[in-house]
Structure formats: C-alpha cells, structure tokens
Amino acid sequence: MRNFIKNHTGIVCILVFVFVFILCSFLFRAVIDKMIDEDRYHSYTRYEIYTEMNQLTYDSLKSVLVEQVNSYIQQSAPTSALDGLVVVNNCMDYDIDICFVLAQGEIESHFGTKGLARKTNSVFNVYAYDGKELHEINKNGKYKHPDDSVEPYIELLKREYLVENKTEYDMLKKYVNYCGKRYASAPDYEQKLSSKIEKIQQTTDIENTYQMLKKQGYILGID
C-alpha cells in the first residue's frame, strides 16, 4: 500500500483534492440553503407581523370612526336608531364621503326621527332599489329599520348622481341627477347641505378619521 502511494503520489493527491472539493461543495451548499431558508422564514415572519399590525391599526381606526359617527348621530338625534357601523361600512364599500352622507341624513329626516321617516324608516327619503329599477322592492319607500335605507340611498347616488366623474362636492353646486332632476325641491338645499358638512368637519374628527381609515384600507388592499 505504501509502495502504491509512493508510486502514485500525484494520483492520490488528485483524488484527495477531488474528495475534499466535493465535500466542501456539499457543506457550502448546505450552509447556503440553510441561510436562504432562514432568510425566507424571517422575511415571511416580518411580512406577517407587518400585515397584522396594519390590520390592527385598521380595526382600531374603524372602531374609533364608528364611535365618532354614533356620537354625532346621538347628539343630533338622541332617539335615532341608525347604527354608525352601517354608515361607515357602506361609505367604505362604495367610497362615498362620510360627512356628505351624515349631513344629508340629518337634513332629510334628522337621522330618521322627523317627518315621514318616522313611519318609513327612510333616513334619506329614498325608495327601495333592487339593483334594476327604482321603487321595485317597495313602492311606499318603507324599510323595516333605518339601517336598511342607507345602502339604497348610496346606490342611488352612485347610479344617478355621481356619474361622468362627478363627486359629492360637485353636488353642492348643483344637486341634480343625470337627467337634470333635483334631489330636493328646496332652492337653498345645496347651501344647507354645504353648511351642514362644514359643521361636521369643524366640530368632529370624523373626516380625518375616515381619511386615515381609507389610507389604511389601501395598504391592506381593502377596497
């Protein structure tokens, strides 16, 4: 054996080198794979933490906003049964300015506590809508609960008023639908609505909280 090694020293060195090289390659690959796996793990963990923190922020902001809306409704109309959560959810779902909605709900029926709304529960004095034709569900415009009247009102805005890139604040100049029909007959309706919105923005943090909630929703991919 010793003679073989002496006679074939070059070959033995090459074989040893190849063996060591292969061994080191495997070890190096194992270390690299472990580092990659750990990096993926930590990156995934950081992403999860980031998402969870954003979700907690979103939920907290939403709770604050609902409380602010309920507080405003109760201060303006203590006997109102309108739930702020319903208002917030619909404004977020349809991307409607929440101060505009609150202002109109207060002007139209004092949040369901005055006028015909006491019998119809139609906070915005809008008839029911089934997605196809106005007045199809309920020709009398009656709802079981004031909360049920919020979405039909917002759908009406989206379908007939907020068209051709018009915004809620365009309605403060001339509140008409695509046919030119006014939402209300009062000639100073736009001024009343504008003043009410300004009051809400100046006396509450509803607008600021709503905008923060929308931004947080964009971060989380919530439409």
Identify the meaning behind each predicted range.
Residues R2-L102, E106-D223:
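Catalytic cores of secreted/periplasmic lytic hydrolases that degrade extracellular macromolecules
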